[in-house]
């Protein structure tokens, strides 16, 4: 009923499915004060998947995209917090069952295959009415100097085909 929620111009989501919406002032807290890093990463990566899906599927309008995002937030929080509504969905008249099945299954796979590849965070806004949340996932990037060595110089020495020029590397480590 409340539509597309925003805090200071940025999209926000209901993070308390059992409380009604009220306009008003809220206080912002870092999500890590009430959620584990794994929970934040789960929600943030799920949202990242839905945003990427939405951006690549022009058949979804902005309201449908936001509704899918809100549903995935509720699904992930329900599983984490024991709300017993893990399969919350939009009405099929709003978004088809096939699209919802694809998005929700895709989000789960995306989370599993991308854990640790993104820096994730969030804020929780508390006050009158339901709590709101904002979550983000930023792809970890950086620079590295690559040194190529070989155990078999007879194959690699003066071999123009043996090159790493133009290669793309993904390097991940704990901070």
Across the structure, where does each feature detected by a protein language model lie?
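Solvent-exposed loop/turn and edge beta-strand elements of beta-rich ligand-binding domains
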Residues: 41-56, 64, 131-175
């Amino acid at each position: 009923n409340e539509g597309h929620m925003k805090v200071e111009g940025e999209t926000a989501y209901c993070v308390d499915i059992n409380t009604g919406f009220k306009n008003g002032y809220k206080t912002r807290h870092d999500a890590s004060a009430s959620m584990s890093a794994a929970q934040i990463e789960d929600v943030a990566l799920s949202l990242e998947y839905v945003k990427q899906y939405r951006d690549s599927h022009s058949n979804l309008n902005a309201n449908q995209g936001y509704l899918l995002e809100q549903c995935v937030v509720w699904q992930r929080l329900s599983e984490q917090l024991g709300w017993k509504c893990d399969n919350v969905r939009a009405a099929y008249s709003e978004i088809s069952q096939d699209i919802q099945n694809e998005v929700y299954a895709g989000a789960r796979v995306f989370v599993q295959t991308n854990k640790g590849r993104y820096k994730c965070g969030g804020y929780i806004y508390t006050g009158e009415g339901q709590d709101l949340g904002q979550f983000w996932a930023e792809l970890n990037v950086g620079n590295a100097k690559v040194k190529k060595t070989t155990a078999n110089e007879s194959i690699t020495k003066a071999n123009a085909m043996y090159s790493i020029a133009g290669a793309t590397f993904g390097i991940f480590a704990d901070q």
